[in-house]
């Protein structure tokens, strides 16, 4: 606070003196170059009067500032801080209505235990297609569909699903073997034809 008042005094004094110098410079430019000694002495007297007025203004400002600073210090000393222990968050009415037990952890399989599941359209098409192409695995498909209706599908482990998938695609495995044999025989036939062509050209 003291620094602020001191800066205010210096700024005020600087502005006041600078303004006086600017006015005196402008007046000196407008006045004639010739002047009497009496006029110079009168000017010095005016300057002395102005300096006295400036000193009085500065003293008055200083006294007012000191009174204000003293009152500020007194007010600061009179302040009393009461130690209050407040809760971090006040409990609102909406927070009181929230029941924590509403979001209890449940068994992930319990909600599907007693529900009946029906296959989707795509699943039903796959089942029908598999029945037509694999009559031997129709019983397995029926068992699987019945299990899916009364139990959760996620209970089956991946190995069991893989085994069921392999059982349903027996013909696909045979077809893969047949295509592999066909590819090998075709490759062998192409090799024989190339050798025959080579022999024919060499005999000529």
UniProtKB/Swiss-Prot annotation:
Its main location: nucleus. It is found in: Nucleus. Residues 36-56 have a biased composition (Acidic residues). Residues 15-63 are annotated as: Disordered. Keywords: DNA-binding, Homeobox, Nucleus. Residues 1-15 bind DNA. It comes from the Eukaryota. GO terms for molecular function: DNA binding. Residues 15-35 have a biased composition (Basic and acidic residues). This is Homeobox protein SMOX-6.
């Amino acid at each position: 606070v003291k620094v602020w008042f001191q800066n205010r005094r210096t700024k005020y004094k600087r502005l006041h003196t600078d303004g006086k110098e600017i006015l005196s410079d402008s007046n000196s430019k407008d006045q004639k170059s010739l002047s009497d000694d009496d006029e110079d002495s009168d000017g010095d007297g005016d300057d002395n009067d102005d300096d006295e007025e400036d000193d009085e203004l500065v003293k008055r400002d200083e006294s007012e500032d000191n009174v204000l600073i003293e009152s500020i210090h007194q007010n600061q000393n009179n302040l009393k801080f009461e130690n209050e222990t407040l809760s971090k968050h006040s409990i609102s009415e909406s927070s009181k209505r929230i029941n924590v037990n509403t979001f209890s952890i449940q068994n992930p399989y319990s909600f599907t235990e007693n529900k009946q599941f029906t296959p989707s359209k795509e699943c039903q098409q796959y089942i029908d297609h598999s029945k037509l192409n694999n009559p031997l695995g129709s019983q397995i498909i029926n068992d699987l569909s019945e299990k899916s209706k009364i139990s959760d599908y996620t209970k089956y482990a991946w190995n069991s699903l893989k085994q069921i998938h392999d059982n349903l695609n027996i013909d696909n495995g045979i077809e893969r073997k047949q295509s592999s044999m066909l590819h090998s025989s075709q490759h062998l036939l192409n090799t024989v034809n190339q050798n025959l062509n080579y022999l024919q050209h060499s005999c000529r």
